[in-house]
């Protein structure tokens, strides 16, 4: 990930600083406890694509159940 890009990217929800996780290919917002994926070298900065994080590991965000089920 380009350091210049990392310096200007912020969390789309809180506008906070992001941390690059090279191994997981994600940008982490510690304030919102979200991990944004990097796909083919491109950060996907959409809240719907982010995963919730817990200390020490990342877990997928559970989709909402459809109404009426």
UniProtKB/Swiss-Prot annotation:
SUPFAM superfamilies assigned: Trm112p-like
Write down what this protein is called: UPF0434 protein Rmet_0534
Organism field: Cupriavidus metallidurans (strain ATCC 43123 / DSM 2839 / NBRC 102507 / CH34) (Ralstonia metallidurans)
Q: Which family does it belong to?
A: Belongs to the UPF0434 family.
The record's Gene Ontology cellular component field reads: cytosol
Source domain of life is Bacteria
Q: Name one Pfam family in it.
A: Trm112p
Q: Matching InterPro entries, A to Z? A: Trm112-like
Q: What is the lineage of its organism?
A: Bacteria, Pseudomonadati, Pseudomonadota, Betaproteobacteria, Burkholderiales
